[in-house]
Amino acid sequence: MKRWVSLDSGESEDPLPEDTCPDLLDGDSNAKPPPAKPHIFSTAKSRSRLFGKGDSEETSPMDCSYEEGELAPCPAITVSSVIIVQRSGDGPTCARQLSQDSVAAAGAEKPLKLYDRRRIFEAVAQNNCQELESLLCFLQRSKKRLTDSEFKDPETGKTCLLKAMLNLHSGQNDTIPLLLEIARQTDSLKEFVNASYTDSYYKGQTALHIAIERRNMALVTLLVENGADVQAAANGDFFKKTKGRPGFYFGELPLSLAACTNQLAIVKFLLQNSWQPADISARDSVGNTVLHALVEVADNTPDNTKFVTSMYNEILILGAKLHPTLKLEELINKKGLTPLALAAGSGKIGVLAYILQREILEPECRHLSRKFTEWAYGPVHSSLYDLSCIDTCERNSVLEVIAYSSSETPNRHDMLLVEPLNRLLQDKWDRVVKRIFYFNFFVYCLYMIIFTTAAYYRPVDGLPPYKLRNLPGDYFRVTGEILSVAGGVYFFFRGIQYFLQRRPSMKALFVDSYSEMLFFVQALFMLATVVLYFSHCKEYVATMVFSLALGWINMLYYTRGFQQMGIYAVMIEKMILRDLCRFMFVYLVFLFGFSTAVVTLIEDGKNSSTSAESTSHRWRGFGCRSSDSSYNSLYSTCLELFKFTIGMGDLEFTENYDFKAVFIILLLAYVILTYILLLNMLIALMGETVNKIAQESKSIWKLQRAITILDTEKGFLKCMRKAFRSGKLLQVGYTPDGKDDCRWCFRVDEVNWTTWNTNVGIINEDPGNCEGVKRTLSFSLRSGRVSGRNWKNFALVPLLRDASTRDRHPXPPEDVHLRPFVGSLKPGDAELFKDSVAAAEK
């Protein structure tokens, strides 16, 4: 029998007890293996069905048990090599193969253990290294590897390494380094360490993903040292962003997983390790980088926003130091969105505000800033905001994404109040769009006057089309009709263009696009009028008057140009969509129900003479109906019941019934439910709606005006867009490769009573209008001071170049030491730069 040799003393130890091996190793063919743990899911189909419903099991889904099966009896195998397991202190175990001489000195050979998936999985799950002592010998003797299919879970493709990673004890599992050493000696280390799940639910997840998810830096280091692929993508259903299904989207890659789980140390290790550094610009299956993934996991809560913005800032700075020329924030996903545009489109207002107002103080990373403080005086400071990816001159700009996003996007109205978006839209409105909008309003008013006049003086004799008489009035009328039809054609094609470009959903059609829809319906009625007119049908008048009525209603669209009227129009819209629609649904149900009951009760001919005489005497003076009115129809009964709703009904409008008590009870119940209950409830709901949306009405109006501004700009020619573009091209510093960093910037003057000018980045000593006065700049990359409203005509680049020249030949007459300025972030957001500010103050 084989004996085991101690590495320290070389003395023999007692042999392992006989019961350490299964009975079948002793040749007992009748012995049965112990029962395996039951499956969580009997089949892959049942498992996917259960997860689709969101059910759970006591056992972790990724740690499901292996299949239950019996071991086939095999003869005992003897080998001449021995595996020695040595534990060095508290560190990981290691394994080595003894030489033949050592084996000979150990004594007689011992029968070798047989291993299958069940035995290996049990050993690694229980952290039992002794059970795996003969595993290497078994694999070498049988010429097998741990990556063979017989050692993997047939349903999920899970290996023993993945099983061990899922069964850590106090953050470690001693079988992991042993398994890696065995894989190395069987020439399958790379394949073994990068083995991943193969089922559709956890497809692509490797041991490195699990180690990062378990927040275990030691295991991450061990796996990377042994060749783990840092670009492995976990793209199973569990790792996709699917509405209504459990899962966690983190960007598929290990780097994104570490970032989205707030593990900065692992992020730095993955990017800076000497074995296989991760690619910071790598994308997942939807084209998202690590920055996109951070935006995706943001949920607008304070704690989450703080960690996401902090991690975003750290990765951005680290990427700039590792790859100075890489523009990580400008990389787009498959939808063509940058991280900034993605934050705007998904309503992540905290992340959006951070990116727009980011001001980095480190000189080597200052080119990552999107905000540059120009000067400060007390609580007042002037800032230059970078307009790249913001203005409409670029595709998928932030303004377009917010304005044209779905109505279900959270914080859609509030995002337009974040600087510089708020001031930028106001500048666009004041400079150009306002005048164009008022001109369009005037033209539309003139169009409606012409349309109304032509409709009012339409011919009434004969059938259309009418002959043109040689009279001045007919010429004016025909001219008005032609202009009215031309306006309808214009609104029709404009509506077609709008629907093709925006492709709004049914909900967005009534919430955000109601004005465009009304203009389109107005055009449809006008075109129907033309068709009926030339078809010799007098019914053209019906469609014409509908188009005329909608035309005047659409005048409310132009209230967007006036704040008070615009907010009032928003309230009307919300009350119609929220309260009136629900009221009309319930009211129509009551009206139809009681009308069918009353019309069933009424019998024509019953007491006809008395009824006709009484009703004729009662109603003829009001001109409401003739003496021979019949109420044995649903239409006439509905009209009578509608009069009860507005308080003009008569309980004795007919006597053609047999059961007077039943008739009166029906009418009284209808009056109570509609005139008393529903109408008063509608009034109360409208009052509540006004109070509720009073605060957000201004934001909604600003959103509507922003849409109008962008629609107006789209009608400009390309040369006009450049001429009317807000902001100015300025040099704000130098790029990492030494070139001029020129950006299109927009100036915003802000007042902040909580952050004073004790911390200054780029600042002029003389704020305001000080032309001709010598300026002392306080930073090596200084910008010139822009004064007042004429800041666009001020040349900033010469001052920067002059400042840079002086910095290259240092002999300053005096040193001005000013501490860096944090910016205009909110108090909660300003804490994100707390560490960098403290370091700068030191």
Swiss-Prot record:
Residues 1-435, 501-513, 560-562, 687-842 are cytoplasmic. Residues 688-716 are annotated as: AD. ANK repeats lie at residues 113-141, 156-188, 206-231, 252-279, 288-324, 338-361, 396-418. The modification Phosphoserine is found at S505, S778, S804, S824. The channel is sensitized by ATP binding. Repeated stimulation with capsaicin gives rise to progressively smaller responses, due to desensitization. This desensitization is triggered by the influx of calcium ions and is inhibited by elevated ATP levels. Ca(2+) and CALM displace ATP from its binding site and trigger a conformation change that leads to a closed, desensitized channel. The double-knot toxin (DkTx) from the Chinese earth tiger tarantula activates the channel and traps it in an open conformation. It is a multi-pass membrane protein. One of its GO terms (biological process) is calcium ion transmembrane transport. The chain crosses the membrane at residues 436-457, 476-500, 514-535, 539-559, 563-601, 660-686. Resiniferatoxin binds at Y514, S515, R560. Homotetramer. Interacts with PIRT. May also form a heteromeric channel with TRPV3. Interacts with CALM, PRKCM and CSK. Interacts with PRKCG and NTRK1, probably by forming a trimeric complex. Interacts with the Scolopendra mutilans RhTx toxin. Interacts with TMEM100. Interacts with PACS2. This is Transient receptor potential cation channel subfamily V member 1. It comes from Oryctolagus cuniculus (Rabbit).
